[in-house]
UniProtKB/Swiss-Prot annotation:
Domain of life (superkingdom): Bacteria
Protein name from the UniProt record: Transcriptional repressor NrdR
GO BP terms in the entry: negative regulation of DNA-templated transcription
Database matches in PROSITE patterns: ATP_CONE (PS51161)
Lineage, highest ranks first: Bacteria, Pseudomonadati, Pseudomonadota, Gammaproteobacteria, Alteromonadales
Domain (ATP-cone): residue spans on this chain: 49-139
Amino acid sequence: MHCPFCSATDTKVIDSRLVADGHQVRRRRECVQCHERFTTFEGAELVMPRVVKQDGSRQPFDEEKLRGGMLRAVEKRPVSMDQIEQALTKIKSTLRATGEREVKSEMIGNLMMDQLVNLDKVAYIRFASVYRAFEDVSEFGEAIAKLQK
């Protein structure tokens, strides 16, 4: 790895630790030439499947879109960023575990609802009302009744 200070090509690893629940390695490095120290983070580059939309179009998986949907659902609710990140990690792991090159957007929506129902019931109803396109109060009532069972 090149030194970010002097661009020397030789650096040595001083310390390595697992971070992010074992999904990343944090390394402290020292340049052999200028002796400056710096930190690097190493993680596996995992390919996510493409998303098949309801209209049949295909697009790359967009983690920020997934995160944005979850953040809107849990807005002003007692859910920590750690809980959100764990839920997103579970969704992504499940998608990768399918082994498929493409997944339907419906599957992603259902995985999101599975995570939200465990995080916060109000957030689940918020997301479901948009995702399932509730049109009247009775549909909200049905969704709430399912939660209470």
